């Protein structure tokens, strides 16, 4: 819509031919990394493009939120930003629901405050694949919630350098690799999954 050239994975295909070109571009990404990067930049980019393709679903729920989604898509598309996502919840007791974790109501990322300027997020989310090299993170909930758990029901886009956002990555495979000759994959293709902790992050 901007008239500028952008990465093919941001494309919203309108024909079979455009869909084929998009698929060929994503195939090229996978071939470049031998299929070892499960969360390369085209992954969440394609997710956002898919949401925009179905923007009418969002408009039926909230025209304002739909506009915000479209604006965000255009923002990251035009800057070709690497967006990761976190949708899984850390739980100390897997037999209990999200809102029944006894240790701390903010073990899982939740809205701790809300005002006219936005929301404040506190708590952790997983599993931020490539978070250490991403530009932005899409924070959402990927599991059903119960009545009374509304504080956990949100979706937000956050810059990875946001004040209060802490990245807790696993150890890098590359750091332990002996050499590129001995470890050709781990020296080049490490996504570094991470737990993200939101310490009163304002959105």
State what each model feature region is:
Residues 2-83, 130-131:
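Internal helix-loop-helix
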Residues 85, 90-203:
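FAD-binding core of flavoproteins
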């Amino acid at each position: 819509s901007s008239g500028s050239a952008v990465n093919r994975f941001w494309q919203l295909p309108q024909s079979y031919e455009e869909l084929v070109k998009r698929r060929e571009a994503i195939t090229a990404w996978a071939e470049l990394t031998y299929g070892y990067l499960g969360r390369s930049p085209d992954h969440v980019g394609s997710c956002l493009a898919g949401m925009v393709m179905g923007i009418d679903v969002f408009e039926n729920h909230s025209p304002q939120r739909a506009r915000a989604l479209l604006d965000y898509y255009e923002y990251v598309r035009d800057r070709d930003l690497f967006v990761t996502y976190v949708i899984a919840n850390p739980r100390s007791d897997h037999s209990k629901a999200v809102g029944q974790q006894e240790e701390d109501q903010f073990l899982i990322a939740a809205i701790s405050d809300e005002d006219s300027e936005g929301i404040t997020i506190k708590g952790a989310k997983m599993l931020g694949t490539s978070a250490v090299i991403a530009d932005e993170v899409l924070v959402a909930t990927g599991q059903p919630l119960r009545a009374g758990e509304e504080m956990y029901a949100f979706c937000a886009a956050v810059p990875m350098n946001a004040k209060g956002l802490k990245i807790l990555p696993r150890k890098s495979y590359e750091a332990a690799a002996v050499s590129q000759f001995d470890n050709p994959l781990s020296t080049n293709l490490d996504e570094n999954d991470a737990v993200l902790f939101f310490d009163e992050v304002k959105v």
